[in-house]
Amino acid sequence: MYNVPSRTGCNILPETAVKLAKEVDNIVAIKAATGNLSQESKTMMLAEGCLDMYSGEDGLIVPLMSIGAKGVISVLSNVAPKQTHDICAEFFAGNVEKSRQLQFEALELVDALFCEVNPIPVKTALNLMGMEVGPLRMPLCEMEEANLNKLKTALKNYGLLK
């Protein structure tokens, strides 16, 4: 199940998510992308093991794992797969401070990857990095120049672009 109210206009409340997980056999996890740590905490508290959680917010990987999320379903991982893996691996190895630091280092790039509607920034980033993922298709359009510069700067600062 994917809870992304910013895209759907509908927020799946914790009670509803848990009820669905208990009543529908093939609902086993939720991708949490509300940005609301209080709500996600309540979901985990009510789930009592019947529902796994994955972060759907690249800027909140560590906070969501700290309340029980099993990992992340990520936009960032398309551009920085090793770094995204390392954030999770360090956390699960018990190196929470290292994981937290890696999360902080990724924040500028995370912000840049979401400065326009997905997948515009991620496809642009991959093309800039030399991975030919093709052009954007209608109705998507090229990034605004200020946002493109923000993305380029973030990629450079993160060591992904020269």
Language-model segments: residues:
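Structured C-terminal cap/extension of enzyme domains
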Residues: 59-162
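Glycine/proline-rich, positively charged
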Residues: 1-52
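Alpha-helix N-cap/helix-start capping motif
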Residues: 24, 34-37, 58, 77-81
